[in-house]
């Protein structure tokens, strides 16, 4: 079985821009991860109309954008439902400036929260750990980089924040997200 690989940030960015869509790779991935972590069905195409409504006034996407969006969705599902939980955020690479990466992370987190809203997350039925993770993400979404502070220190803090975002997202997904059930996972007594 071949491993599903996340498309590169620049590949996704190019496909979205070339299609005339006003959504960044970070925003798209954040939305998808939010919807999946909020309990979106993994077995159908319900994510597409939600994305179309949110990003393109309900209009469908051109084929090239659908292809890359589907690849991002499939890779995200694979990451979030694997035995070894992993999540790589689709944000600008380390080659980009810290400011660009911080902006990408902020876009990602804001759209993750929006993705949870798109699947109508009901906070009154969630655990305290989930509420705390969501509160942390809301705070992180408001963070910024101060160009006058020590950039080396901010670089280190940024990496810690990215890791904390992953932990918060995986906490939310563990409580609300669906898992892919296979015959191999069934226990025989």
Curated annotation (Swiss-Prot):
Coiled coil: none annotated. Gene3D superfamilies: YgfB uncharacterised protein family UPF0149, PF03695 (1.20.120.740). One of its GO terms (cellular component) is cytosol. InterPro entries: YgfB-like, YgfB-like_sf. Belongs to the UPF0149 family. This is UPF0149 protein VF_2102.
């Amino acid at each position: 079985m071949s491993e599903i690989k996340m498309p590169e940030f620049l590949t996704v960015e190019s496909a979205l821009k070339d299609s005339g869509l006003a959504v960044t790779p970070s925003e798209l991935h954040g939305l998808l991860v939010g919807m999946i972590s909020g309990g979106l069905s993994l077995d159908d195409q319900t994510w597409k109309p939600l994305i179309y409504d949110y990003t393109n006034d309900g209009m469908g996407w051109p084929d090239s954008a659908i292809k890359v969006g589907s690849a991002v969705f499939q890779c995200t599902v694979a990451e979030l439902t694997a035995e070894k939980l992993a999540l790589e955020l689709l944000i600008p690479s380390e080659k980009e400036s810290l400011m660009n990466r911080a902006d990408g992370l902020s876009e990602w987190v804001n759209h993750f929260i929006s993705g949870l809203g798109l699947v109508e997350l009901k906070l009154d039925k969630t655990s305290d750990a989930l509420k705390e993770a969501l509160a942390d993400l809301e705070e992180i979404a408001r963070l910024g980089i101060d160009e006058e502070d020590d950039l080396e220190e901010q670089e280190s803090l940024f990496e810690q924040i990215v890791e904390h975002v992953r932990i918060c997202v995986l906490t939310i997904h563990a409580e609300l997200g669906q898992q892919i059930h296979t015959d191999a996972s069934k226990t025989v007594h």
